[in-house]
Each structure stands twice: as structure tokens, then as C-alpha cells.
Amino acid sequence: MKNANVALLQLCSGENTRDNLAQIEQQIKQLNSGIQLVMTPENALLFANAASYRHHAEQHNDGPLQQEVREMARRYGVWIQVGSMPMISRESPDLITTSSLLFDSQGELKARYDKIHMFDVDIKDIHGRYRESDTYQPGEHLTVADTPVGRLGMTVCYDLRFPGLFQALRAQGAEIISVPAAFTKVTGEAHWEILLRARAIENQCVILAAAQVGRHGATRRTWGHTMAVDAWGKIIGQNPDAVSALKVKIETTGLKTIRNQMPVLQHNRFVSSLVPRLSDSKQSSK
């Protein structure tokens, strides 16, 4: 794809899935024609607690939340990436993952990525202690997918702090890497832009990062600043704090020139041990 139009939705999701879906659809309705891919943030369909995540977790390619997104993709004729939602583990039905799902414009599930790195940290904010591993099983596989806008590598939020994952996605042919996120206000203000631009520069990929913004319950506050960064590290679009869509035009034609002039992939002497799970129609039907 030489040029493509993408919309990154900045949301303030909460505990009510219907309200969250309505918020997503309202933003999609306001988009101009020509948008090929819509990306949503982490926790796009549900921003709640462990009990609620377990209650709403769905089977792969089956469930009411996925059906709503499937119908939305068909209705508006766009690809939609759900930044993350709770899913039942493919390895064990007793465990859940926080997973990013990619649907095509016909509503078919084309790719799934289970978040690899769990946000188990202590932050100097009201919430204080974050322990995703108490709720979720970490993923173990890379996911890359062919889309109308280019070859897409998938990550989620805290994954942004682990450059080896991004290098592995680049090695699997990623031209674009998505980073749906719910960065805290504290960590976002300090690190968000720096990390996004660094990952773009290091891997010579376009970075697309849809974000949560605002307050979610009594103790959670997210940074927002949805952002798109080109392969040279230039910010090509950002939305600081509005609950609205960021529309950007991306192009991947310059990637070849940048990569030929500075062949960092060939120069890299470190190899990831992660096993790639390439997305295709066979994976989607499992």
C-alpha cells in the first residue's frame, strides 16, 4: 500500500460494554469515507476489574462482543482492530488473556494477538499497585497480519517497553506496528512519546498508537495522546486529550529507501526466541 487512511480512536472506556461500543460507533460514524482501518485502544470494550474481565471473556471467534464489532465492520465497510478485550485462553479454558483482535471489512476475524508482557508495576498514582498477571495469562506468540494498509505487527500497551518484541515483528515483515494502550497519566507523561518514537526509529516502521484518556472509576487515570509516528520518528498526527478520532494518512513507500540506506535489521546480531504466529485464514478459524 502506497498511501492509506487510518483512524485511531481515543476513548474513555468504562465498565459498561454497551456504552463503550456506542462510543466506538459514534466516532466511526463521524469519519469521512476513505478510511480503511480503524484502531481502538487497550480495554476498548471493557475497562473494569478482574471479576468483570473474567465474566465477559469470550471464546476465540465467538461471543457477543466480537459479534458487535463484526457487524460494525460490515456496516461501515472498514477493518477494525479491537485494541484489547478479555478472551478465554486457547491453551486452557480456565485462564484468560488480554487480546487484540483484527477484523476485516466483512467482519471476519483475521488475527489475534495475546498480550505478552504483563503490567506488574508500582506507580506513584492513586491506584498505586498494578498486577495484570493476577488476572491474565501472558501470550507467547508474535502476530503479524496483511491488511489493506500494509503488513501489521500487533502489540499491546506495556509491550512498548520491550524493544526485542518490536525487532522480532520487524523481522517477520512488519511495516506498521500497532500499540493500543491505556498508559497511566504518570507513565504516559514521562515516557509515552519517547518510547513510540524510539520504536519507530529503531525498527523503521510506522507506529500507530490508539490510547485511552481520562478517568476510569475512582483510581484509574489514563494519559491519552493517541499518536502516529512515521518510520523516521516524525509525529504525523496526535490527539492530546479529546475523546475523538485521529485521522492520519500513512505511506509505506519510503520504508524501502530508509531500510536500504540504514540496514539495521541486517546489522542486528541479537535473535528473539519468541515463536511467530503468522495470521491467516487458517488461524482465524481455529
UniProtKB/Swiss-Prot annotation:
InterPro entries per record: C-N_Hydrolase, C-N_Hydrolase_sf, Nit1/2_C-N_Hydrolase, Nit1_Morganellaceae, UPF0012_CS
Cited CDD domains: nit
Domain CN hydrolase stretches: 4-252
Molecular functions per Gene Ontology: deaminated glutathione amidase activity
Keywords: Hydrolase
Class of this enzyme: hydrolase
Pfam families, alphabetized: CN_hydrolase (PF00795)
Gene3D superfamilies reported for this sequence: Carbon-nitrogen hydrolase
EC numbers for this chain: 3.5.1.128
Catalytic activity annotation: N-(4-oxoglutaryl)-L-cysteinylglycine + H2O = L-cysteinylglycine + 2-oxoglutarate
Residues at the active site: E42 (proton acceptor), K115, C157 (nucleophile)
Physiological role: Hydrolyzes deaminated glutathione (dGSH, 2-oxoglutaramate) to alpha-ketoglutarate (alpha-KG) and cysteinylglycine (specific activity 6.50 umol/min/mg), has less activity against alpha-ketoglutaramate (a-KGM, specific activity 0.20 umol/min/mg), very little activity on glutathione and none on L-glutamine. May function as a metabolite repair enzyme.
The family this protein is said to belong to: Belongs to the carbon-nitrogen hydrolase superfamily. NIT1/NIT2 family.
Protein name: Deaminated glutathione amidase
Gene name of the encoded protein: nit1
